[in-house]
Amino acid sequence: MNLHEYQAKDLLESYGLKVQKGIVAHNPNEAARAFDQLGGKFAVVKAQVHAGGRGKAGGVKVVKSSQEAREVAESLIGKNLVTFQTDAEGQPVNSVGVFEDVYPVTRELYLGAVVDRSSRKVTFMASTEGGVDIEEVAHNSPEKILKVEVDPLVGLQPFQAREVAFKLGLEGKQINDFVKTMLGAYKAFIECDFALFEINPLAVRENGEIVCVDGKINLDSNALYRHPKLLALRDKSQENAKELKASEHELNYVALEGNIGCMVNGAGLAMATMDIIQLYGGKPANFLDVGGGATKERVIEAFKLILDDENVKAVLINIFGGIVRCDMIAEAIIEAVKEVNVTVPVVVRLEGNNAEKGAKILADSGLKLIPADGLADAADKVVKSLG
């Protein structure tokens, strides 16, 4: 689950980090009042969306008066912001953040952390190249990114943070501020179950203060039951409508841009199914994993979800029966086809637990379903069914 910038800053500030002060505004008049409340000569108005690249897309503007703040807010709120991280429709802007002017600054740094699946540890990344796309830095100048793995038994140690500060070229008060920032960020990461966080840029002001000018936090969705206050910050308007509906039925769904809908049980098999569709010249319209313990109701909802996409011109159902029984899947497919009024070809491959029984149920149903014998045969048939 992603947080908005203003929410991320509030959370980080509660852990002792110095952040760029700001006020969230849900309409132009609130934005104008926020400018006056901040009391500076300048302010920065930022669209609050769950996507990067806001500046290049026109979602970040410097304003010099309350009237300018009102005008910028009016141009953003109620519109969709399209960035390189969104789809063609973009993300809806329901609010803007009006933030204080912290410039001029002497330097812009980068600080972030993720759970590294290889080392199975929280890994911090820091760089002198703040304020730019860190992905570009990683690609063009990987040596400019410092990495620190944190031992989960003892946590992040002050000496590790000081070492990073030295390597970043910080000195005096800046070092102490950076250590406090990094230790506070780690505490927040662990206690709030972050999956990822980024501060870009982390600005070094002329007075030596280190301030978070931006903040990005992604929370581990599997741990949200432990954090009801954080869960209350969820903004469903920023989520893909189909993916949101899928999550309500415990389905793992990701929308893609192809025309062959996929329903599979198991993430690995789903990935393999998409690969072989591509191999045979097709393009998957989605990733959809109904899970190892799929129920009839979940399968029906999955089928509806696939066919809600008007780009879908054929469907491939690939089930390997282990915990889930193929005969139950077959009954759910029949029920879903009848309920949804399917008009596209449906290829079904069943293997494993009660596969023969499931195949017979489908064959006796009288529906125009295309049986497949093996994964390659299924991919070949679904691609050919497109004509």
Curated annotation (Swiss-Prot):
EC top class named in words: ligase
Keyword tags: ATP-binding, Ligase, Magnesium, Metal-binding, Nucleotide-binding, Tricarboxylic acid cycle
Residues reported in the UniProt entry to bind Mg(2+): 200, 214
Record-listed ATP binding positions: 46, 53-55, 100, 103, 108
Gene Ontology BP terms: succinyl-CoA metabolic process; tricarboxylic acid cycle
Protein family per UniProt: Belongs to the succinate/malate CoA ligase beta subunit family.
Protein name per UniProt: Succinate--CoA ligase [ADP-forming] subunit beta
